[in-house]
Structure formats: structure tokens, C-alpha cells
Amino acid sequence: MEIEKILGEMEGLWKKVIDKVIKSPKGNLSREEKYNLYAFTIIQLGRTSAQANLIQEAVNTRLCTIAKKHLEILRNSENSDKYKDITDDELNHISFNFPYPAVLALQTQFQLINTCIDLQFKILINKTKVSFITSNNPAAKYSQFLERMGVKNYALGSRGLQIFIPLTPFIGVMFYDPKCYKLGDRKKNYVELTQEKDIEELNKLTASNAEGVLYYLPGSISENQLEKLSGQNKYYKPQKRVEEYPEIPTADGVIVGSYHCSLFCKLSLSFVKELPRYRTLRKQDFNCREHLLREIAYIKDEIVRKTF
């Protein structure tokens, strides 16, 4: 398939920059290398079974809602007796078989690849004795700012977006909204993490985002710690991946829609500081039109054009 060919070409570029970061985490990256690291991280968000399952559930939820609405119309028709034995509860148990959700998830992610081009990143160097864990859904989205504001969900265009992905047990990368946060020293492209609490918090995020499978350095995690991480996944991972929007009535009927439920795990990181404009904002002063979304910047240059 064409998408597999594109992935094969890009994976070679991604491997080069990841190997360079692992070998020299404090070193500088070229503009193209920075973009390749960014592209790897963004594509990874849609390249997992978790995202495929999310797509499947989103399609199922939407089609189930449409089926209920169609049934409602049929019940009000002249032949309503034909449909009286069909209940909404029965429709809730119907599963619509959507072919190749993983392919659609990946295609969608490619279309969204430059949605987060305005984010900056820092290499996270773990200097503690506690190693990073990873999972079968390794790239985790978050927004500490929107969590503090009490907003129920976030997406790639949200204010305060953060994306964390561990590369090794002691090297990770975090992309972040530079208008909302400061990470470490502004003059450095890395942050040295010396507090075990920060590693535990990042591991909590990774565990909560996992799709049932964790990976860790042999001997680095005790059985009690594994049970704790498993408990965090069960507690913080949304029980439902997809929720329906309230119906919007129109002259031609109603508009129905759905949204993805976001992960919130009370993330607390000592090296992430909100900038004054947002740090001083209180929940009661939060305005969706002003504070919910970022001004997305699309860089129209040769590096970006190579990805299309």
C-alpha cells in the first residue's frame, strides 16, 4: 500500500534522529532533524491499536445514534407497527463492523501532521534511579492547563497541549505549547530530571495511556509497582472512549456528533511551569473562545512540503 511505502521511507529518517538524540541528548539538532522528531511523535499518536480501537468505537457510536434517529422516524410513519419490537437497548448492543480502522487512524494522523507544528520540544534526561516505562500506546497527549481549568476534553489544537513519549528508560521527549508553558532553562533544548517524583508522574501518564501492555527495563519495576501502575490505568483511563454531543435541532432535523474522551490523571511535574498569562487565570475567568484553542502555525517551507 502507498501508506506503507511512505512509512518505510520516513522510518529511516526517524531512526537517524532518534539514534542521535539517544547518543547525545544534549546535542543540537538541525531544523530537518527537529521536524523528523516531531513527525515521528505525531504519527505515533495514530499508529497504535489504541487509536484503531478509538476509531472503531467512534464510528460505532455515531452509526448507532443515526440508527436510533432513523428508527424514531420509522416509528412515526404509517408502518410503525413493523418497528415497535425494536428497542433502543437492542440497538445499543449492535456493533457495526468497520473495515481497516487502523488504516483510517493512520491516514487521519498523516492529514493532521502539521496541526501541532507550533509546539516546541525538550529532551528529557532522566538522572534518577527510576527508569521510564513505555507501553503499546507510547505517545501520550495531555494538557495540564485545561485540567486545571476543569475542561473535560482536549485535542491536538488545544491550548496547553503536551505530548510525551519515552525513547529509552532514561531518555524521553516532550512537545509542549510554548505560549502556555516553560520547561527548564529556555536556552537549553533539554531538561535534566533529578526528582524521582517527576519520573513517577510521567510513568503514571504512560501507564494510564496504555492499551493493556507495559514495557519496562528488566528488574527496574517491582510487583507492587506494577500493581500500582495497573491500578492507575484502571482508575484514570476513560471508561468510555467516545461520548455523544447534545443534539442540535435544525429545520431539516437534528445534527448528531461525538467526541473522544480525554485522559486526565492529575499530572504534576516540577519542571513544567505555566507562563504568567495562563498561570494567573482562574477557572471562573476561563473563556472557551479565548483560552481553549491555540493559534495553529503552518510552516510553509521545503521541510514541511517533503511530507506531502
Each model region followed by its residue ranges:
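Alpha-helical structural context detector biased toward long hydrophobic helices
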Residues: M1-F308
